[in-house]
Amino acid sequence: HVRSRRQRQMCIRDSLQLGQYGEQDVRHDPTRAAADPRYAEHVRDVDAETPARFNADPSRLFEASGSAGKLCLFAVRLDTFPKEASTVFYIGSNDPADLTTVRRHLLTALPRLPIAGEYIHRTAYDIGERYGKDTFLLIDRFGTARVPAAFALKSRVDAFFERLGLRGVSDRVIQAVMNRLPSHLPARMREWRDRFEHHLLVRVSVDTAPATREFLSAFFDGRASGAFFECDADEGRKAFLHRFAIAGAAIRYREAHPNTVGDIVALDVALRRNDREWVEQLPADLEDGIIHKLYYGHFFCHVFHQDYIVRKGVDPLQMEHAMWTLLDVRRAEYPAEHNVGHLYVAKPSLAGFYRQLDPTNTFNPGIGHTSRERGWEDCCADSAKGWPQGYRENAG
């Protein structure tokens, strides 16, 4: 049985390497979903006491989905969509409740879901504007196709200097150049940065833009705490590109300030769909160990990326564990988008899923603090009960 399975795998591998496959080999079966077909309904349930999505959600663990290195994957099924004409609205507020109201309305009242809704806190905006500038300019001028080559070149340069005992040379040189350049962001974005602490980028299809515009106009009419503007094409593109550049800005900050920064604690967190207190409040003892906190994320899903730039001399692992405790109190799920890796403890349902996929524990043993022993010993057996119920229902 094992030999025949290996032979099938080698046959698949050889066919892929030789390009010996075609359209006739792809099964267009509607029950073979690339994503959860119920998610649109799920995310609209803004009063639910559970997160909209997180990596270890038992109802969405299936084959490659959530496999975390426990399978040898030759191909995966992905959804594709025609590119829609869209409009971007840029919202700013000093009251988080404003954005909560916007989120709840747009998710429940629009005939179609928004295409995207990205949150940026002012601190993340500032760090991204300065320390993500080179990423922004690279993509803005040359497109995403050049990014892999640029990062490969940077890695080679860093490797050369690290052999000489010098770390982060390219980051510091690039940052010195970027610091001499003027702001690359549109004027209205910079104005909103000065006026408002919380920023929300909303992209909607053109057929829902009138309803969105009407709601935002009525909601912010006479409201001192917030305002919005409708982006032109260039502003909308640059707003979302800025959001993308923020994701790597904390790492650049660390490399540019080696004398003051110890490390970065990076969390991705799924909050409850009905959580109105989504702005994190840290105790003073944790605040004292942090230089900057970067909050940004997928606001309509209530999934946030939280990057903490930790002071030199502070134990980042101890800080992270303390933050886990706070997230547990808030009934959040984490990691939201990343796998547990060898840092987080896999919950029983996830550990059982790993055992289903890899009964011999050959691939990536020990992930999620599970057993490293062949055959799993006594780990995870009780929770390995077959595919999650949700997907058995979908399969019909």
Write out the residue ranges for each language-model feature.
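Conserved glycine-rich FAD pyrophosphate-binding loop
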Residues: G165-G396
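Internal alpha/beta scaffold segment
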Residues: D95-R112
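Single conserved hydrophobic/aromatic residue that forms the stacking wall/gate
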Residues: H1-I12
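Conserved mixed alpha/beta core segments that line enzyme active sites in large multi-domain catalysts
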Residues: L18-S67, F74-V76
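Flexible, low-complexity linker/loop segments at domain and module junctions
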Residues: T80-T87
